A protein has these predicted regions:
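Intrinsically disordered terminal and processing segments
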Residues: 2-5, 13-94, 101-176
Length: 176
């Protein structure tokens, strides 16, 4: 038990280094207000599901884990947010996708952009194009950004992966 606790603390420190946890909480409060309950957990993606989603999205997951945030108000689920990383040109890009209970995207945010170029993918207006998309949407039509081709493609495929993951998770209670 102590070993599991220490592993959780170690992984949490890695994931939430550089103020990432605080930035996510700030994004949640800005979107849903101050009166929401926020719970998060690390979710290990089962290998078969991971492979299936990676093949469909044509992009590998950054790791075998994602962080799932449950945003509730008075025990009513408002949204589920899934945080992951994708590779930019040379550095990871940390992003979070908010979904409603039906799997439609409510919003997408870049939590941490580490590259020297291509930071325009963090622009709120660019990320608005994901709102309303679900697993049946055409993710091939996203706005290009000059100088950010790799980041645009990575974020686009990454968001699609999380939508596919959530659609599968909706059918099970194991992740909650």
């Amino acid at each position: 038990m102590l070993k599991l606790f220490l592993i959780f603390i170690f992984i949490s420190n890695i994931i939430f280094a550089d103020g990432i946890e605080q930035k996510v909480k700030e994004i949640i409060k800005n979107q849903f207000g101050n009166n929401v309950q926020i719970d998060f957990k690390k979710y290990k993606i089962p290998p078969d599901l991971k492979r299936e989603i990676e093949n469909k999205a044509k992009q590998k997951f950054f790791s075998e884990n994602v962080i799932i945030w449950l945003i509730k108000e008075k025990d009513s689920l408002l949204a589920v947010a899934i945080m992951d990383n994708v590779y930019g040109k040379a550095q990871p890009i940390t992003f979070i996708t908010f979904l409603d209970e039906n799997g439609k995207i409510l919003s997408n945010h870049i939590v941490k952009y580490r590259e020297e170029h291509g930071g325009a993918v963090a622009n709120f207006n660019w990320n608005k194009q994901f709102i309303g998309k679900d697993e049946k949407s055409n993710f091939n039509k996203v706005d290009a950004i000059s100088g950010a081709t790799i980041s645009v493609n990575s974020i686009n495929k990454g968001v699609y992966k999380l939508v596919l993951l959530y659609k599968t998770l909706m059918r099970t209670e194991a992740w909650k």
